[in-house]
Amino acid sequence: KFAKEFFEKDFDLIIGSRFKKKNPFLRDGMPFLRYFTNKIMSTFTSLLLNIKLTEFHTGYKIFSRNFAQKVPYLNCSNNYLFSFQVLLQAKYFNLKYDEISISSSYEGFKTSCNYSNGFIYLIQNFREITNFILARANIKNNNVFPKKN
């Protein structure tokens, strides 16, 4: 229901951001280290790639039919990295995207993304940023960022 107005404006991807309003670690009980690393990486990615979003590491997304038909999202990772890759794909394929404010509950918070997995995820993000930049420059393409027609 809340996404209807966005799709009426022809958005291809809607992202749920925990950072669009107040700090989620204060409002929702988000662990500070999780907030801090997400915020730093999201700000870095936004500035480096000129993608106007407040959060890049969220699983809350709604895709349009146009997105599903144009983007090779099935070539993306099947873990946490998927969320980041599809945002980069939306930018790569010049699709229209926006974000809405969401909240999350961290009561009884548990995650499978421990410190070592978090570090691996961070390295994977830098790899995907590099892949995105190389593909945009037509230097090197891959199955996530294929050569455009």
Language-model-detected regions and their locations in the chain:
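Low-complexity, flexible helical/coil segments
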Residues: 22-27, 48-54, 91, 97, ...
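Terminal low-complexity segments of carbohydrate-biosynthetic enzymes
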Residues: 8, 66-67, 123-149
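DNA-recognition element of transcription regulators
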Residues: 84
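Catalytic donor-sugar/metal-binding loop of nucleotide-sugar-dependent glycosyltransferases
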Residues: 51-52, 74-78, 87-105
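Acceptor/aglycone-binding surface of glycosyltransferases and processive sugar-polymer synthases
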Residues: 1-80, 107-116, 120-126
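Alpha-helix boundary/capping detector
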Residues: 70-71, 93-97, 116-117, 148
